[in-house]
């Protein structure tokens, strides 16, 4: 049997000249800006032009390009090795389909079709489902892929045991390496969303809460923990509390902070710049006595094991379903399970 596992992620510019087209692709997505195309495209052009210089400065901190693709390639190779170990009779290959920069779904679709798989598993590198991330990628893939193979989607895995274990290990290692500082708050920081997206039935916030609770349950030494949301932009009300507000609150209370990127499985601009530079500087200004940041799971063995289990476990079904103990409550009407994987 030939198995293609298609890993979805955001993508990132591979050089300064790619920043504007990357931003344009992002903001022309109707899942991000819900306007008709006749209005959305000019607005995307305006936003990408006005934000280009600031974004280029952020990527310059990381060497002028996003590390997301090489990080994802390392995860793909680790997943292939784990699949070969667990299922030696399966010829499994992991492919990468980025949403907003290369390799885009059209390019990856050609590669998958040339591989001619019997089975396809669509596996997002977003543990928590949102219509703005996984939902958008699944729709994009459906438009791009017309090749062979029976397909199904792992829509989410927010509280899968291996994911929680990977985060918990990295948090504990970060704390121990720093000398086990006392009076420290564990802050799970996730990418934010406009509140209206969640109010419309998107399950993302509930799944972030489930992820954080699963990790915290493995870390009894951290009795003080919370959740915050980063990357807020524009005038709309966003999920809260905001990470910058929580940094200021910790400073006012004299608390140290250990920040874990609970919604991210790879290092990229939101971890390496926003958390490591912007919020670290804010913590210093705000009087936070200790500011630590745990790494994203990357190729940590429990996380790669989760991806392998999710892929192999999906082979006996069709459609979209979560991996692990998660099940969306009925209030989340835009979850993937109720909408063919896309919402």
From Swiss-Prot:
EC number, UniProt record: 4.98.1.1
PROSITE patterns named among the record's database cross-references: FERROCHELATASE (PS00534)
Places the protein is found: Cytoplasm
Pathway(s) annotated for this protein in UniProt: Porphyrin-containing compound metabolism; protoheme biosynthesis; protoheme from protoporphyrin-IX: step 1/1
UniProt-listed InterPro entries: Ferrochelatase (IPR001015), Ferrochelatase_AS (IPR019772), Ferrochelatase_C (IPR033644), Ferrochelatase_N (IPR033659)
Source domain of life: Bacteria
Example GO biological process: heme biosynthetic process
Claim: Lyase is one of the keywords in the record: yes
Keywords: Cytoplasm, Heme biosynthesis, Iron, Lyase, Metal-binding, Porphyrin biosynthesis
PANTHER family in alphabetical order: FERROCHELATASE (PTHR11108), FERROCHELATASE, MITOCHONDRIAL (PTHR11108:SF1)
Record's protein name: Ferrochelatase
Annotated source species: Phenylobacterium zucineum (strain HLK1)
């Amino acid at each position: 049997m030939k198995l293609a596992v298609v890993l979805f992620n955001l993508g990132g510019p591979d050089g300064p000249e790619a920043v504007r087209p990357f931003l344009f692709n992002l903001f022309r997505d109707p899942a991000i800006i819900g306007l008709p195309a006749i209005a959305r495209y000019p607005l995307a052009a305006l936003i990408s032009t006005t934000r280009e210089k600031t974004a280029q400065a952020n990527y310059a901190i990381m060497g002028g390009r996003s590390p997301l693709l090489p990080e994802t390639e390392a995860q793909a190779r680790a997943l292939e090795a784990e699949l070969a170990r667990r299922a030696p009779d399966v010829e499994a290959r992991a492919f990468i389909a980025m949403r907003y920069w290369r390799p885009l779904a059209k390019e990856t679709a050609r590669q998958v079709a040339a591989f001619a798989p019997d089975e396809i598993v669509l596996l997002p590198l977003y543990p928590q489902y949102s219509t703005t991330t996984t939902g958008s990628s699944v729709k994009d893939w459906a438009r791009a892929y017309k090749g062979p193979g029976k397909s199904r989607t792992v829509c989410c895995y927010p509280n899968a045991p291996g994911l929680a274990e990977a985060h918990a290990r990295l948090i504990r290692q970060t704390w121990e390496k720093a000398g086990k500082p006392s009076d420290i708050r564990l802050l799970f920081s996730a990418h934010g969303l406009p509140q209206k997206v969640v109010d419309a039935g998107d399950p993302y916030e509930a799944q972030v809460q489930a992820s954080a609770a699963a990790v915290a349950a493995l870390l009894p030494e951290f009795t003080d923990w919370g959740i915050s949301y980063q990357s807020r932009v524009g005038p709309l009300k966003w999920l809260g509390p905001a990470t910058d507000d929580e940094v200021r609150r910790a400073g006012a209370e004299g608390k140290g902070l250990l920040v874990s990127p609970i919604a991210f499985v790879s290092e990229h601009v939101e971890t390496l710049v926003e958390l490591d530079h912007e919020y670290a500087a804010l913590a210093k200004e705000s009087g936070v006595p200790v500011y630590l940041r745990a790494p994203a799971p990357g190729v940590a063995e429990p996380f790669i094991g989760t991806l392998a289990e999710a892929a192999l476990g999906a082979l006996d079904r069709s459609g979209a379903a979560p991996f692990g103990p998660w099940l969306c409550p009925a209030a989340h009407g835009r979850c993937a399970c109720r909408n063919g994987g896309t919402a």
